[in-house]
A protein has these predicted regions:
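Structural signal for interior beta-strand "rungs" in well-ordered beta-sheet cores
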Residues: 1-81
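Terminal amphipathic alpha-helical/low-complexity segments used for targeting or macromolecular assembly
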Residues: 79, 86-95
């Protein structure tokens, strides 16, 4: 995980995840990750992108683009599926 990455609350990051900096191009920089995000094993999140709130990134996904709130992202290249309860049963919040 690049130390310049901004990570929100209730974020789960599993084994083998790379959250990195892109050193050139339009997306030069590090990711910003919202609240209530679940990032699956061996996923890659790279560049000055924004991952919204309530997002599930499936294992092995490659993300180098902005992801809106309430989404599931899977595959390489990543494909976005809109889902209101994306992280339900993956992230427990205590209120």
């Amino acid at each position: 995980i690049n130390p310049k990455t901004k990570i929100g609350e209730n974020v789960t990051i599993l084994n083998g995840v790379l959250i990195g900096q892109q050193n050139r191009g339009r997306k030069q920089g590090c990711p910003t990750i919202g609240n209530k995000v679940w990032i699956g094993t061996n996923s890659i999140v790279v560049g000055a992108i924004h991952i919204g709130n309530n997002v599930l990134i499936a294992p092995g996904a490659y993300i180098n683009f902005d992801v809106p709130d309430n989404s599931i992202v899977l595959g390489n290249p990543g494909t976005i599926i809109s889902k209101q309860d994306a992280t339900d049963s993956y992230i427990t919040t205590y209120e």
